[in-house]
Curated annotation (Swiss-Prot):
<keyword id="KW-0963">Cytoplasm</keyword>
<keyword id="KW-0479">Metal-binding</keyword>
<feature type="binding site">
    <location>
        <position position="39"/>
    </location>
    <ligand>
        <name>a divalent metal cation</name>
    </ligand>
</feature>
<dbReference type="GO" id="GO:0046872">
    <property type="term" value="F:metal ion binding"/>
</dbReference>
<dbReference type="GO" id="GO:0004309">
    <property type="term" value="F:exopolyphosphatase activity"/>
</dbReference>
<dbReference type="InterPro" id="IPR036523">
    <property type="entry name" value="SurE-like_sf"/>
</dbReference>
<dbReference type="GO" id="GO:0008253">
    <property type="term" value="F:5'-nucleotidase activity"/>
</dbReference>
<dbReference type="InterPro" id="IPR030048">
    <property type="entry name" value="SurE"/>
</dbReference>
<dbReference type="GO" id="GO:0000166">
    <property type="term" value="F:nucleotide binding"/>
</dbReference>
<keyword id="KW-0378">Hydrolase</keyword>
<keyword id="KW-0547">Nucleotide-binding</keyword>
<feature type="binding site">
    <location>
        <position position="8"/>
    </location>
    <ligand>
        <name>a divalent metal cation</name>
    </ligand>
</feature>
<comment type="function">
    <text>Nucleotidase with a broad substrate specificity as it can dephosphorylate various ribo- and deoxyribonucleoside 5'-monophosphates and ribonucleoside 3'-monophosphates with highest affinity to 3'-AMP. Also hydrolyzes polyphosphate (exopolyphosphatase activity) with the preference for short-chain-length substrates (P20-25). Might be involved in the regulation of dNTP and NTP pools, and in the turnover of 3'-mononucleotides produced by numerous intracellular RNases (T1, T2, and F) during the degradation of various RNAs.</text>
</comment>
<feature type="binding site">
    <location>
        <position position="92"/>
    </location>
    <ligand>
        <name>a divalent metal cation</name>
    </ligand>
</feature>
<feature type="binding site">
    <location>
        <position position="9"/>
    </location>
    <ligand>
        <name>a divalent metal cation</name>
    </ligand>
</feature>
<comment type="similarity">
    <text>Belongs to the SurE nucleotidase family.</text>
</comment>
<dbReference type="Pfam" id="PF01975">
    <property type="entry name" value="SurE"/>
</dbReference>
Length: 253
């Protein structure tokens, strides 16, 4: 199994290094990751400047100023030969649950892998301690995929409780929960009196029902949420069509 491994926390982050070590016990792994923390980069792609890479002695590749999406794009199309069998992103330091997925560079890296035609996993730890637990869970899932491929055409967004492995209760297939909109902005002043702004914390949970990713992780279960790239709201087609007919927008051109 050939694995392209990326993340959004940066090439030296403990999550990706712990996972790379575990994966190399049974797979051919190429790390291509940002040279610094790019959390919250979502699906951004660098188009207005060139990208430089640096290869470390162990073969890991850092993309200077690159986003997670840049890293997977370069990894698949230029840096990993032969191409990978699967793209894995993580282990993220902190969860990617509910609405977090729309901002997450971790999920975006997996999404880019799927967009380019490869199976893809995004893996996050609900904390900053038990990376070995998340690595063990990921390795188990990948070994299962090697034995019996999962042909859904979907990204698997995996969130692991920050617990020792023997305290994990099991695994659940979940849906994304949701949060209240975030509204906090934290202003500060620099030494010259200029105002600086920090984005505040995420909103609180507003949908954390029993079938959500929030609930699974809170209860000690690994959450596996299938995600897809198509954002079309098919259920709204008729509503939007009827509205356009009723208001006559095209009659005003």
């Amino acid at each position: 199994m050939r694995i392209l491994l990326s993340n959004d926390d940066g090439v030296h982050a403990p999550g990706i290094q712990t996972l790379a070590k575990a994966l190399r016990e049974f797979a051919d792994v190429q790390v291509v990751a940002p040279d610094r923390n790019r959390s919250g980069a979502s699906n951004s792609l660098t188009l207005e400047s060139s990208l430089r890479t640096f290869t470390f002695d162990n073969g890991d590749i850092a993309v200077q100023m690159g986003t997670p999406t840049d890293c997977v794009y370069l990894g698949v199309n230029a840096l990993m030969r032969p191409r990978p069998d699967i793209v894995v992103s993580g282990i993220n330091a902190g969860p990617n649950l509910g609405d977090d997925v729309i901002y997450s560079g971790t999920v975006a890296a997996a999404m880019e892998g799927r967009h380019l035609g490869f199976p893809a996993l995004a893996v996050s730890l609900d904390g900053h301690q038990h990376y070995e637990t998340a690595a063990a869970v990921t390795c188990s899932i990948l070994r299962a995929l090697r034995r019996e491929p999962l042909r859904t055409g979907r990204i698997l967004n995996i969130n692991v409780p920050d617990l020792p492995l023997d305290q994990i209760k099991g695994i659940r297939v979940t849906r994304c929960g949701s949060r209240h909109p975030a509204d906090q902005v934290i202003p500060q002043q620099d030494p010259r009196g200029n105002t600086l702004y920090w984005i505040g914390p995420p909103g609180g949970k507003c949908d954390a029902g029993p079938d959500t990713d929030f609930a699974a992780v809170d209860e000690g279960y690994v959450s596996v949420t299938p995600l897809h790239v198509d954002l079309t709201a098919y259920s709204a087609h008729d509503v939007v069509s009827d509205w356009l007919d009723s208001v006559g927008v095209d009659a005003q051109w």
